Amino acid sequence: MERNVLTTFSQEMSQLILNEMPKAEYSSLFNDFVESEFFLIDGDSLLITCICEISFKPGQNLHFFYLVERYLVDLISKGGQFTIVFFKDAEYAYFNFPELLSLRTALILHLQKNTTIDVRTTFSRCLSKEWGSFLEESYPYFLIVADEGLNDLQTQLFNFLIIHSWARKVNVVLSSGQESDVLCLYAYLLPSMYRHQIFSWKNKQNIKDAYTTLLNQLERFKLSALAPLFGSLKWNNITEEAHKTVSLLTQVWPEGSDIRRVFCVTSCSLSLRMYHRFLGNREPSSGQETEIQQVNSNCLTLQEMEDLCKLHCLTVVFLLHLPLSQRACARVITSHWAEDMKPLLQMKKWCEYFILRNIHTFEFWNLNLIHLSDLNDELLLKNIAFYYENENVKGLHLNLGDTIMKDYEYLWNTVSKLVRDFEVGQPFPLRTTKVCFLEKKPSPIKDSSNEMVPNLGFIPTSSFVVDKFAGDILKDLPFLKSDDPIVTSLVKQKEFDELVHWHSHKPLSDDYDRSRCQFDEKSRDPRVLRSVQKYHVFQRFYGNSLETVSSKIIVTQTIKSKKDFSGPKSKKAHETKAEIIARENKKRLFAREEQKEEQKWNALSFSIEEQLKENLHSGIKSLEDFLKSCKSSCVKLQVEMVGLTACLKAWKEHCRSEEGKTTKDLSIAVQVMKRIHSLMEKYSELLQEDDRQLIARCLKYLGFDELASSLHPAQDAENDVKVKKRNKYSVGIGPARFQLQYMGHYLIRDERKDPDPRVQDFIPDTWQRELLDVVDKNESAVIVAPTSSGKTYASYYCMEKVLKESDDGVVVYVAPTKALVNQVAATVQNRFTKNLPSGEVLCGVFTREYRHDALNCQVLITVPACFEILLLAPHRQNWVKKIRYVIFDEVHCLGGEIGAEIWEHLLVMIRCPFLALSATISNPEHLTEWLQSVKWYWKQEDKIIENNTASKRHVGRQAGFPKDYLQVKQSYKVRLVLYGERYNDLEKHVCSIKHGDIHFDHFHPCAALTTDHIERYGFPPDLTLSPRESIQLYDAMFQIWKSWPRAQELCPENFIHFNNKLVIKKMDARKYEESLKAELTSWIKNGNVEQARMVLQNLSPEADLSPENMITMFPLLVEKLRKMEKLPALFFLFKLGAVENAAESVSTFLKKKQETKRPPKADKEAHVMANKLRKVKKSIEKQKIIDEKSQKKTRNVDQSLIHEAEHDNLVKCLEKNLEIPQDCTYADQKAVDTETLQKVFGRVKFERKGEELKALAERGIGYHHSAMSFKEKQLVEILFRKGYLRVVTATGTLALGVNMPCKSVVFAQNSVYLDALNYRQMSGRAGRRGQDLMGDVYFFDIPFPKIGKLIKSNVPELRGHFPLSITLVLRLMLLASKGDDPEDAKAKVLSVLKHSLLSFKQPRVMDMLKLYFLFSLQFLVKEGYLDQEGNPMGFAGLVSHLHYHEPSNLVFVSFLVNGLFHDLCQPTRKGSKHFSQDVMEKLVLVLAHLFGRRYFPPKFQDAHFEFYQSKVFLDDLPEDFSDALDEYNMKIMEDFTTFLRIVSKLADMNQEYQLPLSKIKFTGKECEDSQLVSHLMSCKEGRVAISPFVCLSGNFDDDLLRLETPNHVTLGTIGVNRSQAPVLLSQKFDNRGRKMSLNAYALDFYKHGSLIGLVQDNRMNEGDAYYLLKDFALTIKSISVSLRELCENEDDNVVLAFEQLSTTFWEKLNKV
């Protein structure tokens, strides 16, 4: 019964998990460094993953520990902060595997004793209360767990852990299918969803019962495993025996010893005693002789057990004396242990486990635990056993060597002492019995010499690039001779048999030509011209929505001497007459303007004063609106004084009222003080005596007597009655505290008053002027400043400068996303106007989807990949030379996951100066230093060009560069400009649900910190406090430690920068904040940690996360924010479906609200009116026909007018009936006029989600994510910026620079993508400069620990990716060989090769990259893409054109060259140009394997789901294609293995011989005095490129040729592994050897054409699926165009088949 319950429920759990697997996100786990996401690793999952690793052989302990440590070090190097958890119950799963019990125990001890990793072993099970509490306290972001165990029962244990983690809102990361590169670890993430929590709540009892049943079953395993070996001995008896053995050893070896010796002698002695007892229990009677005899054929004698123990002791002595370098050369014995040996070995493993379980209890004993990782080496044991039973008996007698022999005798004699119960044999001979321990095999020793090892050596190549880049290492490399078969068999440039009519060498059109031209730039067609005009009009309209800057007309200027704007200008000694007249005129004009403004104020003053009396707040708004438009200081002073008088009056009235007597509304007092601030700061010089008296009186009324006295000292002392009377108006707190606590967001910022003639729209800050100076001096700069701080202005100034200099200079703006490209293009077109020569335009765009005016514009806006295409295009160099400046926006993408290396290429290829902008870089100094080194390189190159130019001029020849290129003298300096101050403060709030309503609790930034964090890292540099939060911090410090020495000094009223200060400024508040932070830090450093901890705890909010599904409360959250006047807001979620669903849920909420308000008969009336309207329309149409035929015009005109009037009336009534009430929409109807609204809606009429977005927009709602078309995104962006939309849900697409400022930002979904970087980018949108004085950030359904980590985590450091690929090398050689300007081309190529960020200041990495470059050349030459001089040939153009898809591009061309596509693409009948559906489907199958690779987790294969439309799992490649792919992969791996063997010389062998994490070394002097050691360790060949630890499992270099070999078998310090080999796996396996199937989404869609089918069966998100299919369709189209260009035969079957497929696929895609 129990088993049935367990089976049924476990199947239900398993199905739930399997159902989630295809939806798993395969993504990078780490983006943060320093206190990043805290996560957990299930220790048993880690153990299972490593022992099931393909390269690992059971019993090789040291290799196992190396795998564990290498994995953990990889996590740590990527910023991982984790704890490893071993549950006590998990041990039950190993009772059938005693060898793993001891390995697990050793692993736990090793991690605890020899590393700093936090290891937890106290939790009994995942269902325990302690575990639940731990999860609540630490809130790990995810748990790494295995999806499959060693057997079904262990798999069920893992399933319980997964289900429980989900129930606790902890995400799960699968240990299978993980891949790692230089910066990222990619894994399958299964997020915790509400449905998982529901499942756990519903099945709470079932889960408990099933878990108990499972444990009972595992407990029975323990008994059944022990009984046959230990008989009646119980668990506790054996434990006691083990304890006694160790205790006895402490007496024998009181001085202590090494764990390997201790483990050896104790486990051997316990094994012998247990086996002795085991044999005794088998004796038929007690009266027999004491000599033990074999009871039956399955039971070996005690002597055989002794022999095994002797061999084990000798093995351990080998471990003690042989360094890893020698052990890594051990012979590989392939024989297995004989069947009769199994009981002995099982018992020995159990004894080892019991010894290890007890060893840590002897902590007082001097036991060295360093070598816990090296207790067993089964391969070495087999080697020794093989020698003694196969070689020694045949007459091969080899000495052990004195040292080894002595140590062995010492160990065996100790075993003898520990046994005591009976006599054991002498140390020698080692074998006294003749039973074979190993099975007999024909070839028991693996012969590596028979394995195929590629011929070491490079093909000779001669090229300028090769010599310049890798020339210094060529002399040390082995090269093949010219008569070597590899060289003589090189593919010559010839026409391939299958491709007779193909011109493979013909230059292809590049990506620029391919990308869709939005309109023909040279066309004179009126329709085209009209579409161009419409486009430019819309762009200006779009640009106008981005900013309210008037367009500037640019006029090209002649080059003048530069002015220095930073210093003061010297006055002239004498003014000319003209200057005097001009000055007088200006004065007169100013006086006239002032008079007008005074008249205007006189006209408005009465109404504003009345408004101030009726409603102070609306009156203040009108007053401030007037102040914004007024320029006269005198008039402004009058207005401010009126405002101050009104505010004081309102305050006095309020204090006298009943309400004011109980609780005072301090917002009125804030308005009083705000007016005083304004008067004192801006108009201090204009104030009269009466004005000062009024201000002083106001201060007295507020209770700030000291401030009043300092401003206007009282002449007469006031009597007590007056003082008492005035006390009732006092705010009750000191002026400093009042200003900080209640006026923080109003505090005046220190801004410069002096305008800069270079900028008209605003007065730039000092740091912004520094940027302008950079541009003026033609310098480069890295600019790091917060979001919305104004760093982009430097970009537009840079553009303006280039536009003014000439008509042909170009500035390139590189943006990371298409959304940002569209936005910047619109801004440029709105900002600047310029009359240019015919054919030239001001602004152009180039993205992969479309382009316009890209090469005939002066400002090009593009994405990195497209700019790289232009820089690497051999025939675009003349255009590239026109570039004067490049602006890189969001340059931190250099450290991203996808396309990061492209940013590197661009930064090193450009010769001109650049601006690199970012809000989030934590190591800008390192980045700047690297970029400066690149600029020094270009300085040298430019000098060479100048010298060449001079010599060419001397001989009368033209220079290669435009004349003005060298005239505009650029600087090679790279400046770093840092600015850390946000204009607006951000305050954070946590949302919680109480009694069905949403509550907000303020989250103080210090609540995110711990004393440990402050001690280790200090306060994060960008963790700032608002003035109110500074006061809260002081109050908390004072409350916790009232007698703290500096309490009075840091009291707000006494603080040095506030003391008796009337106007406290923002900078003063910042100084106070810094003082408090420094004081709290000193508390921690001076031993007052507990007080500091209590302060931080005191600042934490009390709100708890609600257990319910908070996303269902999302509409309520939005409604609450509206009531609090916190809209417009951006709501960030991280799944496309969630973004759309959240927006839809808010719309549904408003619709339901409207329905409850609609009168009962409203729908019926609307229906009646709609019917009437239809009839009237018909009547009007009929009347028109009658009018055309009839002669009686007058009567007909009257009839028409009546119909039209009725029509208009009905339309108005119907509109009124259907009108959305104001409280049922979030749209601000006043923000946008109807015409603008219709224009925006009109653009999305034919878009996929157009109608849906329009319906949402009418309610003031929108959504924004990557799968939307750019027109759909523009609708949301424009209407949000104009204020019409006030609720927008979005993914991280808005984080990268898109200009959508708002009042509030809400994080409404936890995700792996919500990291420190994205948090800063997204939260930076809150608080619109000039509109909001403060920004608000809300956390909705984000756990407290996660919030803390987001606030305190540093942003990622920028670190270099692996910079090279085979296709990049081909593209570089193509540029060097075919470039229009060979010198410039070669300089660019060398810059890319020499200046990767990865190799900066890393000479060893540079040497490795040089070798990788040579490996790439070797492959390209062999495959016929390059000749031996480095010139492109064959299908080099097609391969480089498909560079996005390496290695699929290389495989595709090899299929083409081998004629496989010609064999496949056979038409339905001879002479036909049409291909059958079967041919098309096979073609899609092949292309899906190449360009549509999306893997399922391996465990999903076990699922038994019914699929309705899709096949889901992609079939294998057709046999001929599969064979060709295997051949291609073998060629690649042969070359790559050669490369790895050569590059292994660069390895740091000191590091290679130590464990990566614990740094335990296995080095030492090799043993040379032992003949046996020399004999056993004789396998030195073929073990050069792989780690010596990996060699312990019998691996060789030739294993690298096998595609299933894991990436990390290679040497760790060479900086490259097998993932850099461009192989394309026909079948992919995880590290345990399980097959990972491909998702057949592309082929399934081609068959059924349904996105819904992909959502239901293929488990894809609709938006993701559409995006992937579009990408697939673009690739097919690109290939189709390339093939058409390369083939001169119009009727070639392959070309026709691809054209048919492209057309059909696009037709299907356009229908969805």
Swiss-Prot record:
Interacts with EXOSC1, EXOSC4, RIGI, IFIH1/MDA5 and DHX58/LGP2. It is found in: Cytoplasm. Keywords: Antiviral defense, ATP-binding, Cytoplasm, Helicase, Hydrolase, Immunity, Innate immunity, Nucleotide-binding, RNA-binding. PANTHER family: ATP-DEPENDENT RNA HELICASE DDX60-RELATED, DEAD/H RNA HELICASE, PUTATIVE-RELATED. It comes from Homo sapiens. The gene is DDX60. A motif (DEVH box) lies at residues 889-892. InterPro entries: DEAD/DEAH_box_helicase_dom, Helicase_ATP-bd, Helicase_C-like, P-loop_NTPase, PIN-like_DDX60, SKI2_subfamily_helicases. Residues 772-939 form the Helicase ATP-binding domain. It is an enzyme of class 3 (hydrolase). GO terms for molecular function: ATP binding; ATP hydrolysis activity; double-stranded DNA binding; double-stranded RNA binding; RNA helicase activity; single-stranded RNA binding. Brain, lymph node, prostate, stomach, thyroid, tongue, trachea, uterus, skeletal muscle, spleen, kidney, liver and small intestine. GO terms for cellular component: cytoplasm; cytosol; intermediate filament cytoskeleton. Residues 1226-1370 form the Helicase C-terminal domain. Its EC number is 3.6.4.13. Belongs to the helicase family. Induction: By interferon (IFN). Up-regulated during vesicular stomatitis virus (VSV), or poliovirus (PV) infection. This is Probable ATP-dependent RNA helicase DDX60. CDD domains: DEXHc_DDX60, SF2_C_Ski2. GO terms for biological process: defense response to virus; innate immune response; positive regulation of MDA-5 signaling pathway; positive regulation of RIG-I signaling pathway; response to virus. Positively regulates RIGI- and IFIH1/MDA5-dependent type I interferon and interferon inducible gene expression in response to viral infection. Binds ssRNA, dsRNA and dsDNA and can promote the binding of RIGI to dsRNA. Exhibits antiviral activity against hepatitis C virus and vesicular stomatitis virus (VSV). The keyword rRNA processing does not apply. ATP binds at A785, P786, T787, S788, S789, G790, K791, T792. It catalyses: ATP + H2O = ADP + phosphate + H(+). It holds the Pfam family PIN-like_DDX60. SMART domains: DEXDc, HELICc.
